[in-house]
Amino acid sequence: LLEIILRKLHRSLAAAGLALALAVPAFAQDVQERVIRFGHLNNADHPVSFGVKRFAELLAAKSGGKMKVQEFPASQLGNEMQQQSALQGGIQQMSAPATTSLAGIVKEFGLVDFPFAVGNFAQADALLDGPLGQALIARLPEKGLVALGYWDLGFRNVTNSKRPITRPEDLEGLKIRVIPNPVFLETFKAFKANPVPMPFAELYGALESKAVDGQENPYSVILSNKFFEVQKFVSATNHVYAANIVLVSKKFWDSLSPNEQKMMREAADESRGYQRQVSRAAAQRAVGELQAKGAQFNELAPAEQARMRQIAKPVVERFAASYDPAIVKLYSDEIARIRK
């Protein structure tokens, strides 16, 4: 009798084991142990880093701890172009650069950098999370990249060591470091500044040595990188809304199972709202903190901002004429929709 009971127990345990194996194929079969090298340019106290950490927590939870994200902040894996090449080559798995860095491989990403295109965060999110943002993302796989959505970097503002910027004329003659991106170059040329393209990692040294007079970045970047130590004036030009884009190496992506890809997409989607919230709260705090560190802060009168928009308009029209007309039409339609 005992033998029969033990046999039945053994059979039921085996059946239960099989049922369990079938119920959790995610962890048992098609999720492998993986280490994902996630590089970015920002410091560990910057909102982009908080986004990486939240993404890592979510992905670890979804994969039963099998998919681990290893963060490399502060340009440890190279500048934006070096990290982009590493993703394309499959050497690095993930990065979160500014969308501006992609204009060299998909020129239509320049649309995101058009000056004074959006007036607030709600408009920015609607533009990037909607059809335009997705149409741009669809251009990346053929370039060796997969994008999982957009994070917040913030509205860009000018700092310099010479004078407050209260009107467009105040930019005249200033050597302003810009992202190596044609839209930024031509925008600041329109303001009669002297734009100097330069990798982000070299920027602090260039400001310190006075190789350049100023730069333009969101408040949280200005604070996190201690630019207030080498820049006296912070001016709320709000000339461009900047976003980061969560990128994955296509070579790495193609090596993942559908389930692993699903977990990565879900973790990216769920971390996006958190990252944006943290980033926007940090930007609000940063202005006061910059003033406390001795920076002179000024806002621009709406009339002067409107003048800047008019000066930049021919730049927008010139670049729009050089892009894929279908994407430009989509951009125009979307801008009209989000401004309603």
Residue spans for each PLM region:
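N-terminal secretory/targeting leader peptides
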Residues: Q29-Q123, P131-Q134, A138-K340
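Sec/Tat signal peptide C-region and signal peptidase I cleavage site
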Residues: V24-A28
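Hydrophobic alpha-helical targeting segments used for export or membrane insertion
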Residues: L18-L22
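Bacterial N-terminal signal peptides that target proteins for export
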Residues: L2-A16
